């Protein structure tokens, strides 16, 4: 039998052997060739109260990095920006798909809409919420150098299944602050002069929508998908009417927005 001294020697040898095999990583040659995971900011409404929104986003099957409350427009951070949250789902923008992995999700407490016998009623955002959102966008965009084209709504990246943040969302005000795009009214007016005379073919609308960032197939047909994508574009840039019809005003706005690269 081994005595105590021999047992101690064996234990020491095993310990030293383990140390000798320990993984050592040399960090003296860092690469400059990388960028941030975060390329997009996706904006949503919750279609729920604050309490319900917090419960859904922290214990449900969806999540976001930030939530802006109502009443006092408190900004809640629900997840570290290093992590992927589950807010975008099946999505695409400018050729990039499944944006959960490359975006920061911001939810805003807002009921969304309700349907009445006379039509759908949408809910506005409060001034406090808009100011809180602008401050948050400035903070995030500055740190990650987000391209204004990549600040989008859920309806932009998933137009077949989502309507948020809705037609009352203040996209123009965000764009004026540098967060997003908004077409110059004079440029739209000039472009419309041509389209008032003759509308372009459906394939042209599809091509311009793709240039603007929307996921759409060039079928040349006014199919269900094309109507949904047109409606998403209209809801973003012409919220007074978003019926998915390829009219002259839509063509003019689309031409200008698609050219804002």
Where are these regions (language model features)?
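Active-site-adjacent loop/helix surface patches within enzyme catalytic domains
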Residues: 21-149
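Acidic/histidine-rich, metal-coordinating catalytic segments
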Residues: 146-161
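Short acidic, glycine/serine/threonine-rich helix-capping segments at coil-helix boundaries
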Residues: 195-257
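Second-shell loop/turn segments in exported
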Residues: 92-95, 117-128, 158-161, 191-198, ...
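Bacterial N-terminal signal peptides that target proteins for export
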Residues: 1-8
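Acidic, His- and aromatic-enriched active-site or binding-groove loops in soluble protein domains
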Residues: 33, 67, 167-190
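C-terminal motif of bacterial Sec signal peptides marking the signal peptidase cleavage site
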Residues: 17-18
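Extracytoplasmic/secreted proteins, especially bacterial periplasmic and envelope-associated proteins
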Residues: 61, 70, 128-139, 169, ...
């Amino acid at each position: 039998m081994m005595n105590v001294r021999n047992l101690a020697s064996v234990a020491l040898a095993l310990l030293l052997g383990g140390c000798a095999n320990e993984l050592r990583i040399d960090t003296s040659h860092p690469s400059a060739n990388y960028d941030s995971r975060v390329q997009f900011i996706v904006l949503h409404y919750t279609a729920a109260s604050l309490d319900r929104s917090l419960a859904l986003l922290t214990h449900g099957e969806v999540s976001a990095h930030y939530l802006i409350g109502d009443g006092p427009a408190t900004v809640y951070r629900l997840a570290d920006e290093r992590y992927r949250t589950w807010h975008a789902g099946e999505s695409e923008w400018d050729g990039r798909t499944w944006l959960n992995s490359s975006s920061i999700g911001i939810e805003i407490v807002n009921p969304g809409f309700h349907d009445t016998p006379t039509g759908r009623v949408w809910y506005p955002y409060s001034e406090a919420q808009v100011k809180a959102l602008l401050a948050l966008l400035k903070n995030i965009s500055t740190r990650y150098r987000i391209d204004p084209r990549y600040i989008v709504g859920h309806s932009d990246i998933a137009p077949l299944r989502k309507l948020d943040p809705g037609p009352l969302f203040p996209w123009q005000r965000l764009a004026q602050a540098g967060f997003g795009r908004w077409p110059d009214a004079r440029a739209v007016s000039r472009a419309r002069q041509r389209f008032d005379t003759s509308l372009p073919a459906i394939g042209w609308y599809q091509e311009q929508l793709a240039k603007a960032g929307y996921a759409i197939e060039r079928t040349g047909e006014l199919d269900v998908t094309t109507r949904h994508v047109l409606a998403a574009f209209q809801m973003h840039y012409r919220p007074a009417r978003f019926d998915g019809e390829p009219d002259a005003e839509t063509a003019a706005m689309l031409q200008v927005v698609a050219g804002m690269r």
